Amino acid sequence: MEFSVKSGSPEKQRSACIVVGVFEPRRLSPIAEQLDKISDGYISALLRRGELEGKPGQTLLLHHVPNVLSERILLIGCGKERELDERQYKQVIQKTINTLNDTGSMEAVCFLTELHVKGRNNYWKVRQAVETAKETLYSSDQLKTNKSEPRRPLRKMVFNVPTRRELTSGERAIQHGLAIAAGIKAAKDLGNMPPNICNAAYLASQARQLADSYSKNVITRVIGEQQMKELGMHSYLAVGQGSQNESLMSVIEYKGNASEDARPIVLVGKGLTFDSGGISIKPSEGMDEMKYDMCGAAAVYGVMRMVAELQLPINVIGVLAGCENMPGGRAYRPGDVLTTMSGQTVEVLNTDAEGRLVLCDVLTYVERFEPEAVIDVATLTGACVIALGHHITGLMANHNPLAHELIAASEQSGDRAWRLPLGDEYQEQLESNFADMANIGGRPGGAITAGCFLSRFTRKYNWAHLDIAGTAWRSGKAKGATGRPVALLAQFLLNRAGFNGEE
C-alpha cells in the first residue's frame, strides 16, 4: 500500500474517495463543513434526516456529491470532539481503512489528520495513521493455501496536512511509520510461525538475511552450542539440552555511528521457540501458544530491521537468544545446580522458569560490547499478566533515567509500559540453601522476583527489562502475535537518534 502527503483544499481533490470526520451530535469537522458548503448543504441535510449521528464507528458513504470532483465522500463518526484521544483516533483510522477496503475504494484522500488530538502534532497523526493502516490490513496467511483478498483492495492513501510547510514533516512521518510498521510485521510474522518451522536455526537464518539485505552496516554472527560451552554459558545450554534442535544465539550488529566513542545500545530478546515447560511440564490446554515464547526475539529482530531501514545515526546490537525447552532423557531437572557465565550458581526449582536462565548468560555475554544501555525483552512471567493484564508491558530497571526514557517513548508511541519496583526486599525470595540463588522466588511478586534475578547479572551497565508476557500475543478469535514492543523500542531509538517528532 502506498502513502503520501499533500496540502490542498477538499473541493480540488479528484480522487476515488475523500474521508472526513463527523462529531456527535451531527457536527461536521472543519473540512466536512467546507464540503457541505460547496455542495449547497447536501451533507448537512443528510445528517438532519438522521443518516449519521457521529458516534464512534459509524460510517456513511456518499456517491456523486454535488459540486465535488471526487467520486465518493466517506463520513466517519469520531464521537464527541472533546473526548477524542490517541486511542479513539487510532480506532477512527482503523474503521476508515476497513470501510475503504471493503467498499472497493482503491485510493483515498484522508482529511482525518485535521482532527484535534490533545498534545499531538501532525507528524504524530500521520505516522500513527500509517502504522494503524498497516496493522489493520495485516493477516497471517503465509501458510494458507487459499488467501482471501478483497476484489478491489485499498492501494493508495493520501494524507492532507494544513500547510505546505508541514509537507516535509508529513513525509518524514510516513517514512518512520512505514519502517516501524514493517518492523512490527516482521515481528508478527516470526511470532506466528509454527515451532516446527521457527526454531533457533530459523531465527538465525532470518538474522543472516537481515545482514545480507543491509550489508553496508549490518553484520550477523551466530554462536552455536560448542562456542557457548567454551564461553561458559552453561545456564543457557541447560535449558535447550532436552531438545533435538540446537540452541543458537544470533548477534546482529548495526553500526550507524563510526565514532570510536559511540557505545552501542544492546537489545536482548528471549527466543524460546517452544516452551513445553520441560520436566516441570505445562498443562496441555493452551500449550500451542507457547510458540509465542520467542516474541521477545521477534521484537528485537523487528526493531533491528527498522533501525537498518531508517539508517539511524546510532549503534545498536540485537541478540536473539534462540532455544527450545523440551522434556526428555537429557533435559535439565528440578534440583540441578547450574553455573552461569558470570560464575554465579543457580538452583533450579522449576524448569518452566527457563527464560531467565537463558537471559542471564546473554546479559553477561553482552558486557563485551561496553554498552550505553541494555534492554532485554521477554515473555517472562505469568505473574506480569496477573499484575498488568494484556494492555500494558511491565518495565523494571536499575537506572532511573533509562526507565524514564522508556516510559516517555511508550507514551509517545502508544505502546504503553508501566514501571514495577526492584527493591532489595524482593531479592530475599531468591535465596537458596545450595546455590547463590534459586531460579524462582515463589508466587508473591513473581514478575518482580524474575526481574530481581536478572538484575544480578546487569551490574556493569545501565539495564532495563520489558516483560511482555501479557502483551506479546492475543488469544481467542483474534489469536496472533501483536508485534509489541517494537513501536515502544522504535520510538526510544528514534529519540536517541534525535528524531522525536516534535518539529
UniProtKB/Swiss-Prot annotation:
Q: What is its main location?
A: cytoplasm
The record's catalysed reaction(s) read: Release of an N-terminal amino acid, Xaa-|-Yaa-, in which Xaa is preferably Leu, but may be other amino acids including Pro although not Arg or Lys, and Yaa may be Pro. Amino acid amides and methyl esters are also readily hydrolyzed, but rates on arylamides are exceedingly low; Release of an N-terminal amino acid, preferentially leucine, but not glutamic or aspartic acids
Top enzyme category: hydrolase
Any one GO MF annotation of this record: manganese ion binding
One GO cellular component term of this record is: cytoplasm
Amino acids binding Mn(2+) 2: K270, D275, D293, E354
* CDD domains for the chain: Peptidase_M17 (cd00433)
Binding of Mn(2+) 1, residues = D275, D352, E354
Q: How is the cofactor bound?
A: Binds 2 manganese ions per subunit.
Q: Please, which domain of life does this record's source organism belong to?
A: Bacteria
Keywords tagged on the record: Aminopeptidase, Cytoplasm, Hydrolase, Manganese, Metal-binding, Protease
**UniProt-listed InterPro entries:** Leucine_aapep/pepB (IPR011356), Macro_dom-like (IPR043472), Peptidase_M17_C (IPR000819), Peptidase_M17_leu_NH2_pept (IPR023042), Peptidase_M17_N (IPR008283)
**Where located?**
Cytoplasm
EC code = 3.4.11.1, 3.4.11.10
Question: Which residues are named in the active-site annotation?
Answer: K282, R356
List the cofactors. Answer: Mn(2+)
**Does the keyword Metal-binding feature in the UniProt annotation?**
yes
Tell me which Gene Ontology terms the entry assigns under biological process.
proteolysis
Described function = Presumably involved in the processing and regular turnover of intracellular proteins. Catalyzes the removal of unsubstituted N-terminal amino acids from various peptides.
Q: What protein family does this chain belong to?
A: Belongs to the peptidase M17 family.
This protein is called Probable cytosol aminopeptidase
* UniProt organism field: Escherichia fergusonii (strain ATCC 35469 / DSM 13698 / CCUG 18766 / IAM 14443 / JCM 21226 / LMG 7866 / NBRC 102419 / NCTC 12128 / CDC 0568-73)
The gene for this chain is pepA
